[in-house]
Amino acid sequence: MSKKRRKLNKDFEKKIYSSKKNVELVLAKIYDIDDEDIQKEYISAFNRVVYLFDELKENYELHGFSDNSKELLNNYENAFNLFESEFEI
């Protein structure tokens, strides 16, 4: 049985790459915080964003671009924006 080919989307790949860089930047800023309690609070709050990014990336790698891709990207972006609005980093 032949394997189904993933549908790719260059613009979507650029958004994933940009999202990855944003996650890495925020994590680096969080790890630079000296106060352990504040750092733990930020990490705890940012974990949801990281989880949603990982879900987005894995879904694209496994299934390619699909109807679900836009929803996953939207969920990630909303969580990232919410984190930025609630935490000054």
Residue spans of the language-model regions?
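N-terminal acidic leader/helix
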Residues: 3-37
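Acidic, low-complexity, intrinsically disordered interaction modules
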Residues: 37-73
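A structural signal for well-ordered alpha-helices, especially hydrophobic packing surfaces
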Residues: 23, 27, 34, 50-57, ...
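Amphipathic alpha-helical binding modules
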Residues: 65-89
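Amphipathic alpha-helix face/heptad-repeat signature
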Residues: 12-15, 19, 42-45, 72, ...
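Short acidic DE-rich linear segments
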Residues: 1-10, 82-89
